[in-house]
Amino acid sequence: MSGTYDDSVGVEVSSDSFWEVGNYKRTVKRIDDGHRLCNDLMNCIHERARIEKVYAQQLTEWAKRWKQLVERGPQYGTVEKAWHNLMTEAEKVSELHLEVKNALMNEDFEKIKNWQKEAFHKQMMGGFKETKEADDGFRKAQKPWAKKLKEVEAAKKSYHAACKEEKLATSRETNSKADPAMNPEQLKKLQDKVEKSKQDSQKTKEKYEKSLKDLDGTTPQYMENMEQVFEQCQQFEDKRLSFFREVLLEVEKHLDLSNVESYASIYRELEYAIKSADAMEDLKWFRNNHGPGMSMNWPQFEDWSADLNRTLSRREKKKPTDGVTLTGISQSGEQSSIQNQHSSHLSVQSAQSTNNPFEDEEETVSINETENKKIENVGSYEKTHPAEWSDDESNNPFNPSDTNGDNNPFDEDALTTLEVRVRALYDYDGQELDELSFKAGEELTKIEDEDEQGWCKGRLEGGQVGLYPANYVESVQ
């Protein structure tokens, strides 16, 4: 991100105001935060799309299983037809949720990804071009004023020191007059010292006043230049805020599938909440709390006070707030250099990858001959025994784990490739049953190439096969 401004070294900060030396960095950091927020929003949509896919699969499996049970059961007539319509409804809802999943990934996710790529341009040395341009603009605008401010601080310090010395010399002269042992020569030296200290005080005072006047003369131009760079940053943030609002409204439209009043009211409230977002209001808040709208304790002439043993520095009056350090993924020792080069980007990416896993290989589910026999047995059993509901999948004869993938409407062609040895760059804990877990530095075998969602299939040393994020490993040389 932004570097430390050289000319600000030694300048004491008296407040948290935007106008203080170096306090523009919060505005520069907001640009980097915008890139991270794009990743956060993409992962949020990614995870919701996965939920939609899993729910659609469960509805299809449920409808297929219960169609067979009702057909072979004792129910008949219009009630049987009505019962069948319940499964037909599930199939249609399943299709709708698959459409939602596709819309979220193919439209909303891709739209954010493309906008982020167009808005932020990475540099070879790390960071983003937009961040560096803003930082350079602020530093250039602040450099002349910061230099004058350092001169004011130095002049004030010299003046206050001279005043203190004058006070001490005057006190010694007064005490010496009351001392009968003090000879005229010594008294004359003290008087000369008092006179010299008064002259020094006057000179340093004049220099202090002159440097302060020079600073006041450069302040209007300083404010104008800083305001100009800040407005450029505001325009960039305005585009991001407006884009996020637009994307959120599109996501809301894709999610709103229900005509039931209770669901409709939820989506009305969601739409109202999103449409209540106002980019201009956000920009106004940032301006008043972190920008030119903040109050400023402009430097003024401060006379020396005899009651003070020392002068409070600008830093002692109010220390600036410490920055916030983002922490991310753990890594092996041999990858520390890579992490240092890309710490800002990787810390965000890794945290999001861990918390928002998503894979698009479809789980295959169908009913084989063995399950058909189970269905027949259950159907005949339920004709003579009352049914008892249980959520325990281990006792469910129609558990999806007993099925194969011959007739699964969600099945996709698997990607094949030669087996390649890879090494984990970071720790990863699988979030689903079909995902692998490993530690940084651990080696495994990649058995399928990366899919369109960024996942690979691999095999651990113990033989376990599953999915893992492609950017969590590197090829073993």
UniProtKB/Swiss-Prot annotation:
Question: What is a GO molecular function of this protein?
Answer: phospholipid binding
- For this entry, the protein name equals Protein kinase C and casein kinase substrate in neurons protein 2
Pfam families linked: FCH, SH3_9
Question: Is Repressor included in the keywords of this UniProt record?
Answer: no
Source superkingdom: Eukaryota
Q: How does it sit in the membrane?
A: Peripheral membrane protein
User: What Gene Ontology terms describe where this protein resides (cellular component)?
Assistant: adherens junction; caveola; cytoplasm; cytoskeleton; early endosome; endosome; recycling endosome membrane; ruffle membrane
Subunit record text? Interacts with adam13 through the SH3 domains.
This protein's record includes keyword Lyase: no
For bias kind Low complexity, which ranges apply?
328-341
**At which positions is motif NPF3?**
408-410
* Coiled coil start-end: 25-274
The UniProt regions of compositional bias labelled Basic and acidic residues, in chain numbering, are 163-176, 186-216, 370-388
- Domain-level remarks: The F-BAR domain forms a coiled coil and mediates membrane-binding and membrane tubulation. Autoinhibition of these functions is mediated by an interaction between the SH3 and F-BAR domains. The F-Bar domain also mediates the binding to the cell actin cytoskeleton through the interaction with CAV-1.
Q: Which residues form the F-BAR domain?
A: 11-282
Q: Which residues form the SH3 domain?
A: 417-477
> What Gene3D superfamilies does the annotation carry?
Arfaptin homology (AH) domain/BAR domain, SH3 Domains
Stretches of Polar residues bias are at 342-357, 395-407
Keywords annotated in UniProt: Cell junction, Cell membrane, Cell projection, Coiled coil, Cytoplasm, Cytoplasmic vesicle, Cytoskeleton, Endocytosis, Endosome, Lipid-binding, Membrane, Phosphoprotein, SH3 domain
> Which CDD domains does this UniProt record tie to the protein?
F-BAR_PACSIN2, SH3_PACSIN1-2
